[in-house]
């Protein structure tokens, strides 16, 4: 019996020697390696989530703006089309780049498509605007369908008057084209005003055309265009209707403002993390979208904005949007897939952009910024 016991001891010692020295810290190192591996996996997961979020944003913007593809407008074309006018400069200069704040309330329940606030429409030529001498007259405006279904708050016609060398009085007249009358009349007056100009640079002048626009929207067939005249005391026309050399961006244009209906908001809470965070739970991470990196020159402003994204694990009862989510899992743990880390609070961004018809639109795109993340 003793011999058998000694034999077992020898065999055990031989196995220990064959296995090599025993490291007392081996268990802790293994746990540390597992932890590091988990962190690496979390980083890779977040990287994939970032990429997916950016691709989703590109698709959402085109869809919400009702664009099948990104407008193909070159930088040279943009430089020619972009008016050097006060209302547009004001939008760009005072543009409120999307802030990453944590204010109470948000547009959680929001319409899918963009809400238009301001539309800047450039003139186009029309066959009807032809005089007997064959010279086209400005201007004919085609209106976006967005104006048709929104209440017009303001409509301004902006015209640029060339500089003068001496003080002069300018008589501005806006005429609306109509179908030829029996007496040959083809125009009816819209607005007329008198301006005193001093030597120096040219000036932009705005004219209220809200009533005319509303009539055009009610009776589209009556929209045959307008003619602009701005004559000085010597009979010289100072209005830029067809820009010449060095007059890019001085075309006449219409600035139309429409109503925007605010929606109710609700509060929510969640975790905020940075890219170096070791937080494994559902959290909001920063993400800046750069439109110039996409080659999307058709977006005038903002050139970039903070979109953010959600990533992390969802333990049951942690940041769940709906209380019943936990109860459903408890009742049927195998039949429930469990909660996922998703945005629970989002807010819109304002955007100034060219649409497919080369019109400049200033509108609000809903649900483009992740403000809070949670499990649902």
UniProtKB/Swiss-Prot annotation:
The record marks 99-100 as: Cleavage. Glycans are attached at residue 72. Its main location: secreted. Residues 1-24 form the signal peptide. It holds the Pfam family TGF_beta. Synthesized as large precursor molecule that undergoes proteolytic cleavage to generate an N-terminal propeptide and a disulfide linked C-terminal dimer, which is the biologically active molecule. The circulating form consists of a latent complex of the C-terminal dimer and other proteins, including its propeptide, which maintain the C-terminal dimer in a latent, inactive state. Ligand activation requires additional cleavage of the prodomain by a tolloid-like metalloproteinase. Gene3D superfamilies: 2.60.120.970, Cystine-knot cytokines. Disruption phenotype: Mutant animals exhibit muscle hypertrophy. Expressed specifically in developing and adult skeletal muscle. Weak expression in adipose tissue. Acts specifically as a negative regulator of skeletal muscle growth. Belongs to the TGF-beta family. This is Growth/differentiation factor 8. It comes from Mus musculus. The gene is Mstn.
């Amino acid at each position: 019996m003793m011999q058998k016991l000694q034999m077992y001891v020898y065999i055990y010692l031989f196995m220990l020697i064959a296995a090599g020295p025993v490291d007392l810290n081996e268990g802790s190192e293994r746990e540390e390696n597992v932890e590091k591996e988990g962190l690496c996996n979390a980083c890779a997961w977040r990287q994939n989530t970032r990429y997916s979020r950016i691709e989703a944003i590109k698709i959402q913007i085109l869809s919400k703006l009702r664009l099948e593809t990104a407008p193909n407008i070159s930088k040279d074309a943009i430089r020619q089309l972009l008016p050097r006018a006060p209302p547009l400069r004001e939008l760009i200069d005072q543009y409120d780049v999307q802030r990453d704040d944590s204010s109470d309330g948000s547009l959680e329940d929001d319409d899918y498509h963009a809400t238009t606030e301001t539309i800047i429409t450039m003139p186009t030529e029309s066959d009807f605007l032809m005089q007997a001498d064959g010279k086209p007259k400005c201007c004919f405006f085609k209106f976006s369908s967005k104006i048709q279904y929104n209440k017009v708050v303001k409509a301004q016609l902006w015209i640029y008057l060339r500089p003068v060398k001496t003080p002069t009085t300018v008589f501005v007249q806006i005429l609306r084209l109509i179908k030829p009358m029996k007496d040959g009349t083809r125009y009816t007056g819209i607005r007329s005003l008198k301006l005193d100009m001093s030597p120096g640079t040219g000036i932009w002048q705005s004219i209220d055309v809200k009533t005319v626009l509303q009539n055009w929207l009610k009776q589209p067939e009556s929209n045959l265009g307008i003619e602009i005249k701005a004559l000085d005391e010597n009979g010289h026309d100072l209005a830029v209707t067809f820009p010449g050399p060095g007059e890019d961006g001085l075309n006449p244009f219409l600035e139309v403002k429409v109503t925007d209906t605010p929606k109710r908001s609700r509060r929510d809470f969640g975790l905020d993390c940075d890219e170096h965070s070791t937080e494994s739970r559902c959290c909001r991470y920063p993400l800046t979208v750069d439109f110039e990196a996409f080659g999307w020159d058709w977006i005038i402003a903002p050139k970039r904005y903070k979109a953010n994204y959600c990533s992390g694990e969802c333990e049951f009862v942690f940041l769940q949007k709906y209380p019943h989510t936990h109860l459903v899992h408890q009742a049927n743990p195998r039949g429930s897939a469990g909660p996922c880390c998703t945005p629970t609070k989002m807010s819109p961004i304002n955007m100034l952009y060219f649409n497919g018809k080369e019109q400049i639109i200033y509108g609000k795109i809903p649900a483009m910024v992740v403000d809070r993340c949670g499990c649902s």
